[in-house]
Amino acid sequence: MTDPVVALVMLGILVSTIMIGFPVAFTLMALGVGFGYYAYFQPDQAFFDNRVFYLLTQNTFTVMNNDALVSIPLFLLMGYMVERANILDSLFGSLQVALRAVPGSLAVATLATCALFATATGIVGAVVTLMGLLAFPQMLKAGYDTRLAAGVVCAGGCLGILIPPSIMLIVYGAQASISVVKLYAAALLPGFLLAGLYIAYVVGLAVFKPARAPALPKERTDFAFGQVLLMLAKSFFPLAILILSVLGAIMFGIATPTEAAAVGAFGAVVLAAGYRSLTWQSVREAVYLTARTSAMVCWLFVGSATFASVFAYLGGEGLIKSTVLGMNLSPITFLLLSQFIIFLLGWPLEWTEIIIIFVPIFLPMLPHFQIDPLLFGVLVALNLQTAFLSPPMAMSAYYLKGVAPKHVLLTQIFG
């Protein structure tokens, strides 16, 4: 039984329930099973003979057997172990000293640390929170403008969405059925270019408005070259070698993303051991967080696949596609419109919901407009990175507010 109107009602209920805080994965599954039972209903069938139950079990098996998704828990474990290696403090300190001659050195060191740490973890909230605890108070103490300091931490922390090994790009690749390796290669340059533009802006601001980013006192910048090199050798180079090993193996085809992620996870454990922070407590926390996040992503995929199958069967996907194609949009107009919608969705929703629920609505239309899914995916990542920085619902600002000193107002962070 097909009915596009029922499909649109199904989509409307989904959006409404997500907005009021229902668990997304189980909402998707519940709506998929409920409306699927209606769609596949046959009067002469027993209750559990309905096709929707076969669809649910088949989707569960398919998701759990997806090679692209196997790398997610391994990259997450790598990120959580690096996070618990207590390397961030020494990394930030060494980069701060190494960049001491650069105007706005504290902010530049913060952005460089965020970019490097994002490359090692791919976890946005973790980077913003950790740098909010470490770098934000130091910038305020050094006399930096509160708005500039907050913007640097939030912008730098969001780089993990775009810079490989971004978990978001893996999920997008699984949804769009394209190579994660190609996605990483496509996103690497834009990610570091964006980080470079952030740094250039901070340096320019420090040069022309030094009151907003004062120079550090001489006693904090008086280090011999050998001391700087030793500090970098202890903090920067080990992490850089780990990152280059993982990304290099992926980019040059030496290993698949899953194999490289496994090497990265093992390397992160070795790194934690080298910094004497490998404890039973840290391993247990990292494994628990990895399992929790991985389970969330997997069940989101199961729910999304079930919902999407029923939605398409009812005629909802065909209705949306025919409506959009009937508007006779140019490829550029379609690209701008779709990215604008994704940008608006990035205010109230997490990237997981956007990539798994809403992006697949646009994917079937890309061939008609001759838009490369790789380009579309990189633009989505860049777009969401911007949305997570944009008031009134900038998620990175709320991450920072949670760890910022009490006198720092949310309006100052938004500013």
Regions found by a protein language model. Give the residues of each.
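Alpha-helical transmembrane segments of multi-pass membrane transport proteins
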Residues: 1-415
